[in-house]
Amino acid sequence: MDKPSTKIVNDYTHFYAYSWHVDEESVDETFIRVYGLDEANENVCVSVNGFRQFVWVELPSFIDWSLSHNVDRVVRYFEQTWPNVGVQFKMYRKLYGANLKQSRSNGEYVHKKFPFLQCSSMSWKMLKFTLPTALKTPQRIMGLGSIKFRVHGQDACPRLQLTSKYNLPTAGWIQFKGIEILDQDVKFSQSCREFMVDLSDKNWGKPSTMICRSDKTTVPRPLILSFDLEVNSEEVVTMPKATKPGDVVFQISCIFNRLGGVENEVERYLLSLGNPTEQIVGATILRYSTEKKLLMGFRDLVNEKNPNVITGYNIFNFDIPYLMDRTVYKSIFVEWAQQGFAKNRPGIPREIRWSSSAYKNQEFKYLDCEGRLYIDLLPVVQRDFKLNDYKLKTVSTFFIGETKDDLDPTSIFRCYREGTRDDSPKASHFMSICGKYCMQDSMLVYKLFEKLNVWYGLSEMAVVCNVPMITLFTKGQQIKVYSQLYKYCLAAKIIPEKDGYIVAENERYVGAHVFTPKPGLYENVIPLDFSSLYPSLMIAYNIDYSTCAFDASIPDQLCHIMEWEDHIGCAHDPKVVEKERLTQLINTLKNKEEVSRMRKERSEITKSLSKNVMCEKRKYRFLKSTTEDGRFKGVLPTIVQNMLDARKETRAEMGRLKKRLGTAVGEEATHLQTQIAILNQRQLAYKVSANSMYGITGVKAGMLPFMPVAMSITFMGRTNIARVAQLLQTQYQGELVYGDTDSNYVSFNHKNMSMSELWDYAIRVADEISQQFPPPIKLEFEEAIYSKFLILTKKRYLYQTALRDGTIKKEIGKRGVVLNRRDNSGFIRKIYQNMVDSIFNHVAGEGRDLKSVVLDVVTADICALFNHQFPVDDFVITKSTGNYGDLQPENFVNEKGVPRAMLGQYNVPCLTSQVREEERIETEEQEQNWYLDKLPAHIQLLEKIRRRGQMKNEGGRLEYVIVETNSLKDKQSTKIETLPYYTKNRGILKLDYLYYLHRCINPLDQILKVVFDLDDFVKRQYKAREAKKKVTLELGELFRPNFIIEKSQLQLVRARADEVYRLVYGTAADCRAQLGELGPDWCVRAKFEYVPLVDDPYRYFQQKYGATGSLKTKFDFEGRDIRLNNQPESKLVSTLKREFK
């Protein structure tokens, strides 16, 4: 008897959803497939069919929709015009604006509702494209006339609508009833338990009972694949390129294990060409005879093991794009890309571009395979941690104390060449060394994935933001906020209108207020902070889209009124006023020193002035909402309040679990640790989401822009922090040392107080001031007294913390100073730290005075510098590198009408025709060099590295040192070199100690000025050593022997009609004559200057690179002709350059 192909499941089936796929291939119906794990960690695929997606069509208010025949007419028109669209007349609130009306019965104000048609369809294409496009044209409806409609809600994809309507977690436990598909031939997926839920089938009851949120809390254990590639480069000194024949993917390491798995559960595989040995590699070896078979073997292994998560390090920028490009080059992409749970369906290549404050600029590729969740660990680490560099070796050493073998790219390429040469033990050894290194990369990534709780962090953030986990990588912040807001609006019957507010040109919000500090070294400073300032302001003053009262008929007593003036860069701006005052004094004073000081001060003001001038009066009103009367509570305040409450509950639960953990052992302890880790990631997700909620309102071109909210929140933030500062000074006789955004640093009259008394006083002050603000605004004492507080300028300070019992912590906190900046060398940080330590650790009355101690420390460090007592690593500088567009400029005209150019993300001067003529720039190479000179020095170094054929480090941070040249006037771009290059040539190159000392002048002299009122101490030290260096260079120049080396030219020329090359050489005149003899059909492809050590460069070149040569690189020679022999022209040019430089 044949087995049934399906089985009806009447009881709820539970599964943990982690991946969502919207299938829009069908024109008539959109399908949603959800992939997850059941309670036994088996793979599950749930196909949700019959879900009617929806949009809202706004109806004009000038028609009386209380008349049923008007409603019937418009509904009938839509049903007849679009038969596949379901239409319902609804009255909803609008998101934008406080739309109120007075009740006729009691005169109270109530929310006004507006007429909409809710249009639903099985086809998302119909609702997203067909219907909105048609409705752009006014529709003539019998009895109603010509009506122009507006469509809202099409920004919400079917997945967002489904999860919002039925309150489903995007990463969490879901329960459903439906049909289980048993027949493998009928199944859509492979290696999954497969179910179908048809929401349109009335026999199952209401759709909300067919699929809904589950109350299970079991922690799933997805199968994780961590992988890494090793790729050859046939050029040896250049980065691999997928379209080059010899740039072969020759090894792929794969680590499989369940989340939370132990070491002995790990499955290790190395897919490799050649013949590596398992003993050295420490993994099961899967050997392949060709690269194509290896690539397909990777696909087969993925499909066999069926991992839920595929992770690696920098895989979005290298590994996955390279595999995709390589399989395209090998003409196997479609077959290779069939790596998802869906049978015989290739993954879709996705190219992503977006940016945010956390992730910065993101540009990457990945393969969108159903059911596979791709997670790149590099952007996760970059977002959450500040490190000097983000190389895997650095990150793994920092977090898990493990490292990997040192194997640079050149050695990897050699392992490939030697390892694939033959089947000898030597070849096997080379391939094994590389395989071991490759396996180490994958294992470190897996351990980091576990250590950093990446799964918990992403899943909890996905749930809070109502987006799938992959969206956290592929989309920016706006979609996260929009998804939360959409879900709330759907439940509250509020329409999130598209283009509901048009941002005016003069609407820009001013940032937080920063008080001008009183620089100095203070004792026992109290830090007082607003807790979650912007979310609290949003709640306290009910600042929201739906509460902004533009309607003048709404009385002021119902509203919070916010009125202020914005003066930025205009005549009323205090900075501009001060600049004008300084200008007048400069024109009248005759004292040169005073004039110089004022010019410097004026220059600083000019730099700080905003280019965007604002001179505006603002007034906004927002409906009040109280605990007793919450009728008018806004959407954003409600969402934020819910998140803050949920965070509070989560943290309380963490506290209870930590208490239990103190006495737990064995499996119970492990379970509690896991629960605490999950809850910690959850409370962080609530915190991050609550703090970023208001940001979407201030993005002019965003999904839901509303500048009045952003402007009013920042205004109230400035107002409240200023009010606290006033209260601290007037009511509590405190001295305001500094204030910034949400914090005040105040010094009370503490000489007669013990530390515990001062502590208690700070708590009382914070509580009393909090009572003067509406809840939930709360001023908090940070539970730390800064026993010493060194304030330098705005946003730059250092402090040492004391506890209630007077215990002083050794660590020195810092903000905005040299110690916080990763682009400063270790030497600068050391000398700065030594100075700071000497100030903070000095005890008055013990030994010498503070000034003598500090100056001795600084002087000793400077002497040690020029005595070579610091290691080389202390002079390494790291800076992040950006895309510079391969030196291909995109010209534009800026707001001032000045021609500029963009080189990738760098804004540089434009090469105008006038400059081109003046500087005689004729060739493309000269143009590129001109633009290169306009880029930052470390970006110029990046291009220098590329031209050398070396590979820049992963993670976008470049390490370099500054070396001496023969001139003190040379630009930094001339002196800058990579650390490996310097190390290799340190017998010739010397570090430029003067440069490093010069970098210390401002930060060190700033502290000395603030603490001791001492001017230019380090600067004078620098000037003395600079003078000495200048004399040394002049003496060296005076006694330097002069060598006259005559150089000849060598030119590579090519026939225009044929790919035939020749060499012409000799003096410049000789080359011109030879080229003239060849005729007009020959053109110059490359020029070199060389010392003529050989009589006939052509014969030397032919003997070395001809058919009988021993080298791998060969060209065809016939007479004086040279042919490429299937190699690129660039190969011939680089070979000539190397031989005759």
From Swiss-Prot:
SUPFAM superfamilies: DNA/RNA polymerases, Ribonuclease H-like. Belongs to the DNA polymerase type-B family. The keyword Nucleotidyltransferase applies. SMART domains: POLBc (SM00486). GO terms for molecular function: 3'-5'-DNA exonuclease activity; DNA binding; DNA-directed DNA polymerase activity; nucleotide binding. Transmembrane segments: none annotated. The keyword DNA-binding applies. Its EC number is 2.7.7.7. InterPro entries: DNA-dir_DNA_pol_B, DNA-dir_DNA_pol_B_exonuc, DNA-dir_DNA_pol_B_multi_dom, DNA/RNA_pol_sf, DNA_pol_B_thumb, DNA_pol_palm_dom_sf, DNA_pol_type-B, RNaseH-like_sf. It comes from Invertebrate iridescent virus 3. One of its GO terms (biological process) is base-excision repair, gap-filling. It catalyses: DNA(n) + a 2'-deoxyribonucleoside 5'-triphosphate = DNA(n+1) + diphosphate. Keywords: DNA replication, DNA-binding, DNA-directed DNA polymerase, Nucleotidyltransferase, Transferase, Viral DNA replication. DNA-directed DNA polymerase involved in viral DNA replication. This is DNA polymerase 120R.
